[in-house]
From Swiss-Prot:
It comes from Geotrichum candidum (Oospora lactis). InterPro entries: Beta-tubulin_BS, Beta_tubulin, Tub_FtsZ_C, Tubulin, Tubulin/FtsZ-like_C, Tubulin/FtsZ_2-layer-sand-dom, Tubulin/FtsZ_GTPase_sf, Tubulin_C. This is Tubulin beta-2 chain. Mg(2+) binds at residue 71. Belongs to the tubulin family. One of its GO terms (molecular function) is GTPase activity.
Amino acid sequence: MREIVSIQCGQAGMNQVSTAFWSTITDEHGLDADGHLRPDASSLESDRLDVFFNEASNKKYVPRAVAVDLEPATLDAIRSGPLGHIYRPDNLISGESGAGNNWAKGFYTEGAELMDSVMDIIRREAEQSESLQGFQLAHSLGGGTGSGLGTLLLTKIREEYPDRMLSTYSVLPSPKVSDTVTEPYNAVLSFHQLIDNADATYCLDNEALYDICEKTLKINRPSHQDLNSLIALVMSGVTTGLRYPGQLNGDLRKLAVNLVPFPRLHFFTTGFAPLFAKNSRAFHNLTVPELTQQLFNPANVMAACNPYHGRYLTISTIFRGQVAMKEVEDAIHTARTKYSPYFVEWIPNNVQTSVCNVPPKGLTTSATFIANSTAVQELFERTANQFSVMFKRKGFLHWYTGEGMEPVEFSEAQSDLEDLILEYQQYQNAGVDEDEELMDHEEYADEGVEDFN
C-alpha cells in the first residue's frame, strides 16, 4: 500500500482540524468510533484502508497519526473525545509548558526538547509501512506550537526522508479573526520553512472560513467546530484519490507534479461544492455543471484571496459520486473557456480532472477544487505588511531573542517571503500583452461573487 503518516501539531492542527478529518474518513471507510469495520461496510470502503490506517490486533484499524502539542490539555481533549479510543496511545505526545504563541519556543527551545521522542514515533510509523509515500501535516501558522514545532518537524522529516512527499494543511492567521499580536511574526517565520521543506501547502484561513459559514451556510455565530468541518471536507476531498480506487487518481507525487510548475510555487487554495445552509435542500443534488460553477465561485475559496485578482497556473478537480468522466471533462472545458483570461497561457493542459464513484456521506455528488493561483500572493502580502509594521519598531522582538533567535533570522524570512511574492507576480505577468484580455473581463474581479449567483 502507499501509506501516508499524518502529523497533527498544535491546538488548531491537532485537537480541532484533525479530529474533524479523522471523524470524516472513519465514517467514509465504514469504521466505527473504536476503529472496527462496521458490518455494513462495503469492499470499496475498506479496499484501501491501509493508506491512512494500520491494522492492529482484533481487526482494529488505528490511524497512522502522530499528535503533538506543547501543553497537555489538547491531548487530554483528544483522549476524552468521541475518537479517543481509536488513536494509538503512545502516539500522543505533549510537553508541559506550551509555546506562549512564540514561534521560537516551538522551533528552538520547548519544541526542540520533544523532537527526539516525536521522531522516534514517526520512524516507527514509517517502518510499519510497506511503501510509504509521504507525510501530511495539519497545523496553524499563527500560534507558537503549530508554527514553530510544526515547521521544525518538517525540516527534520525532510532531512530524514528526502525522497518522500511532504504536504501541509496550513491555517493562516487573518486580521479579522486574530488570536494574538505575534501572529505575523509566527507566520512569516513559518513560510520561510514551508518554502524550502514542503512539497505542497494547502492554504486555509479563518477569515474565509467564517465568511463561508456566515454568508453561504447561514450560520449566525460560527464555532471552531463549524470551521473545522469545512477544512475536514477539503482534506477528505483532496485525499479521495489516495483513499479510493478511481479514474485518473494518483498519489501525493502525481498530484504535486500536476500542480507545481516550479518548486517554490507550491502554495494552493482550495474549494468545495456543494456548500449550502442546513435547512436548504436546493443544493443537495447539484449537476456536474452546477458543481463546477460553484468551484469557480470566489466565495467558495477557503482562503481570503480573490482568484480573479490573479491567474491560475494549474488546477486539479476531484469529483465524487455517480458522474460520468465525459460530463466532468465537458463542464471543466466550458469553465476553462469562460475564464480563459484568468489562466496563464504558457502552461498547456493545466487543468486536471479525476472522478471517484464513492460520494461523501450525506451527499450524492461533490467536488473539490485545488488551485495553484498567483492570487495566493494576496495572503502573503497581507502577512508581510503586518510583519513589516511590527518589525520596523521591533515590537515584541525580545520575546523571540529571549529564546535565542537573532534579528537577522527575521530579515531573512522577510526577504524570502518578499521574493516569493515577486515570483508569483513574475509568472502572473509572463506572456500577458498589456493585460488587454483581463481588462475586458474586469467585472469578474470587481464584482466577485455576484457573477456566480
